[in-house]
């Protein structure tokens, strides 16, 4: 009886994991981190329960956008090695089920944010989800190599949403956090596109290396990385412990530029992968340090 019960539970566990992967959890982790950063560094007080609700809504909104993105992109996901194991092309979840999950989570996250937190945070969450789905996924991604640059605005909104959850208004400080993520996004994804250049070409996605070549992409990565560096120093102007922040942000940022320069010089995929991996670690450490420097 016990063996039969365990056997019956396995398919359920696998199904739950499939739906979890549909929500793009790796992206969700960074989205939640940046959103929580906005909540923590914002002036004023917020009830812990409201902070938790805001964080959950940001997470659900991110997952909703990820699910609808997978629904819309399931045709091109099936063509690329990196994405063909995703739940829809792998045949684990139907397109209709993915769309239903995305729409339901979108409605729940935005509605709860508006009712339990405040209207502006709910509106910004709706804009973030809508921008990622309609502007980036449905329009920009398959039409222009600037898809990542413009579409990155959606992923840069969570710290503003976190900030407005506390204050009810947008500020310069929250816009600085937005700008950091906005400038970080292109070199992060262009490093990935260098790694998967032929995959994007096969799927006819106009990523920068496909439309303008590898050398041009490397120049863009280097330029954006250099421009990102001084922007990441700006939080030191308003954090309570600017010394802690700057002694962390400066070497982190310099290493980011060094990695970008390595990509520029190299034609080895190893350096592209290192740049991509480091960019994730970089953002995680940077925003963690922003939180710690606010106390």
Curated annotation (Swiss-Prot):
Its EC number is 2.5.1.141. Keywords: Cell inner membrane, Cell membrane, Heme biosynthesis, Membrane, Transferase, Transmembrane, Transmembrane helix. GO terms for biological process: heme O biosynthetic process. InterPro entries: Protohaem_IX_farnesylTrfase (IPR006369), UbiA_prenyltransferase (IPR000537), UbiA_prenylTrfase_CS (IPR030470), UbiA_sf (IPR044878). Pfam families: UbiA. It is found in: Cell inner membrane. GO terms for cellular component: plasma membrane. It catalyses: heme b + (2E,6E)-farnesyl diphosphate + H2O = Fe(II)-heme o + diphosphate. It is a multi-pass membrane protein. The chain crosses the membrane at residues 30-50, 51-71, 93-115, 119-136, 148-168, 175-195, 219-239, 244-264, 275-295. Gene3D superfamilies: UbiA prenyltransferase (1.10.357.140). One of its GO terms (molecular function) is protoheme IX farnesyltransferase activity. Pathway: Porphyrin-containing compound metabolism; heme O biosynthesis; heme O from protoheme: step 1/1. Converts heme B (protoheme IX) to heme O by substitution of the vinyl group on carbon 2 of heme B porphyrin ring with a hydroxyethyl farnesyl side group. PANTHER family: 4-HYDROXYBENZOATE SOLANESYLTRANSFERASE, PROTOHEME IX FARNESYLTRANSFERASE, MITOCHONDRIAL. Belongs to the UbiA prenyltransferase family. Protoheme IX farnesyltransferase subfamily. Carbon 2 of the heme B porphyrin ring is defined according to the Fischer nomenclature. This is Protoheme IX farnesyltransferase. It comes from Ehrlichia ruminantium (strain Gardel). The gene is ctaB.
């Amino acid at each position: 009886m016990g063996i039969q019960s365990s056997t019956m539970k396995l398919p359920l566990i696998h199904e739950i994991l499939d739906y979890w992967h549909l929500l793009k959890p790796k992206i969700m982790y960074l989205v939640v981190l940046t959103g929580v950063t906005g909540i923590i560094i914002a002036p004023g007080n917020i009830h812990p329960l409201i902070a938790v609700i805001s964080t959950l809504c940001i997470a659900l909104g991110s997952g909703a956008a990820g699910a609808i993105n997978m629904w819309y992109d399931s045709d091109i996901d099936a063509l690329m090695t990196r994405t063909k194991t995703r739940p829809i092309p792998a045949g684990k979840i139907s397109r209709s089920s993915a769309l239903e999950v995305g729409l339901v989570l979108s409605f729940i996250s935005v509605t709860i944010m508006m009712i339990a937190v405040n209207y502006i945070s709910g509106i910004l969450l709706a804009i973030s989800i809508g921008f990622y789905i309609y502007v980036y996924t449905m329009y920009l991604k398959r039409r222009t190599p600037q898809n990542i640059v413009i579409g990155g605005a959606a992923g840069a909104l969570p710290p503003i949403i976190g900030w407005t959850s506390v204050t009810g208004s947008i500020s310069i400080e929250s816009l600085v956090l937005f700008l950091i993520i906005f400038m970080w996004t292109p070199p992060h994804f262009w490093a990935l596109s260098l790694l998967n250049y032929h995959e994007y070409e096969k799927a006819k996605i106009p990523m920068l290396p496909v439309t303008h070549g590898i050398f041009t992409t490397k120049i863009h990565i280097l330029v954006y990385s250099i421009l990102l560096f001084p922007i990441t120093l700006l939080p030191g102007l308003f954090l309570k412990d600017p010394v802690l922040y700057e002694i962390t942000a400066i070497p982190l940022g310099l290493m980011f530029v060094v990695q970008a320069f390595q990509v520029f010089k190299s034609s080895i995929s190893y350096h592209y992968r290192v740049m991509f991996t480091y960019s994730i670690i970089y953002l995680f450490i940077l925003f963690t340090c922003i939180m710690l420097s606010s106390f």
